[in-house]
């Protein structure tokens, strides 16, 4: 009788271990999926931000971590959950930009001495937050526009009846037909003290997505 009791206790501990392992799998899947969503969104934000600066479109909301639909990010979360043998639902949130994921394991706990475990799946939740790491820096000094040359004025005609039209005055230097100014250079100041200068006319040495935004798991 004592041996049977010990066996039952051992099987119960085994069932608890199975459940814990399945629960850990669910949490791993949820964490990975949430981070995958945040990282996908961060990459999209970075691309959209630099494109907006290059074309002169509004960009400050993008620098704040907003302005890109979360559809692709959530699709990335669901794909990563599948890599961890789980199904996931993803919900995008704002202020701060975040992605909440609930993952359910595809495998069950398995058969054990505890009734019903063969049909029990584990669930877990995770949330990733995307936060800006940079703020707008000082605006560059505007380049002064040279004034066009001034003319000498029209000449006067002679004093006869009809009067000659006279020589026309020199119109001075013709106005300079400068091409329209392109989008302005943008300075960014980031958390690590790094200063970035994004020049639309010279798109080199640009910040990476990880320089502009951080992604972390949150409670």
Describe each region flagged by the PLM.
Residues 18, 103-107, 119-122:
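Functionally constrained cores in energy, signaling, and assembly domains
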Residues 35, 86, 131:
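Residue-level marker of positions within ordered structural domains that often coincide
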Residues 112-219:
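Low-complexity, S/T/G/P-rich flexible repeat/linker segments used as non-globular hinges
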Residues 1-68:
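Alpha-helical assembly-interface signal, strongest on the long, hydrophobic N-terminal helix that forms
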Residues 39-111:
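Short amphipathic secondary-structure patches
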């Amino acid at each position: 009788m004592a041996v049977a009791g010990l066996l039952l206790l051992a099987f119960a501990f085994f069932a608890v271990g199975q459940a814990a392992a399945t629960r850990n799998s669910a949490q791993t899947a949820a964490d990975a999926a949430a981070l995958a969503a945040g990282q996908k969104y961060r990459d999209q934000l970075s691309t959209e931000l630099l494109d907006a600066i290059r074309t002169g479109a509004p960009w400050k909301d993008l620098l704040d971590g907003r302005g890109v639909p979360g559809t692709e990010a959530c699709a990335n979360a669901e794909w990563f959950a599948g890599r961890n043998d789980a199904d996931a639902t993803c919900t995008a949130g704002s202020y701060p930009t975040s992605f909440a994921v609930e993952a359910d394991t595809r495998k069950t706990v398995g058969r054990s001495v505890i009734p019903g475990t063969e049909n029990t799946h584990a669930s877990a939740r995770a949330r990733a937050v995307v936060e800006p790491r940079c703020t707008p820096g000082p605006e560059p000094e505007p380049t002064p526009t040279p004034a066009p040359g001034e003319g000498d004025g029209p000449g006067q005609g002679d004093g006869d009846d009809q009067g000659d039209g006279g020589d026309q005055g020199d119109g001075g230097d013709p106005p300079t037909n400068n091409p329209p100014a392109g989008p302005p250079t943008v300075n960014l100041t980031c958390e690590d003290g790094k200063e970035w200068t994004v020049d639309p006319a010279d798109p080199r040495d640009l910040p990476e997505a990880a320089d502009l935004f951080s992604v972390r798991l949150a409670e």
